[in-house]
C-alpha cells in the first residue's frame, strides 16, 4: 500500500464516518449495518484501500463498529454516500 494514497482514502473515510455518525446520533440509531459508497471510476480512490482502511476510520464511532462497507463503481470523479443501512 502506498502511504500517500492510503492517507487520501483514510481522510475521506474519516469524513464519511463523521457524517454517518452524526446522522446516526441525530436519529437515535445505535448500530449501522452497512454503508454503500458510490465511487467514480476516475476519482482516484482505490476501492481496495477504502475497504481495508474503513475499520480504522470506523473505530472512532460506536454506531459503526460492525458496519460493512459496500462500494459501487460509477462513471465520474466523485465519491458519494448512496445508502446507510440500519
Regions found by a protein language model. Give the residues of each.
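Charge-rich, low-complexity N-terminal segments
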Residues: 1-86
Amino acid at each position: 500500500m502506498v502511504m500517500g494514497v492510503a492517507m487520501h482514502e483514510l481522510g475521506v473515510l474519516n469524513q464519511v464516518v463523521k457524517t454517518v455518525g452524526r446522522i446516526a446520533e441525530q436519529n437515535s440509531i445505535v448500530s449501522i449495518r452497512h454503508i454503500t459508497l458510490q465511487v467514480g471510476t476516475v476519482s482516484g480512490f482505490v476501492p481496495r484501500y477504502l475497504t481495508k482502511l474503513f475499520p480504522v476510520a470506523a473505530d472512532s464511532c460506536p454506531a459503526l463498529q460492525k458496519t460493512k462497507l459496500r462500494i459501487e463503481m460509477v462513471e465520474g470523479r466523485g465519491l458519494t454516500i448512496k445508502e446507510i443501512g440500519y
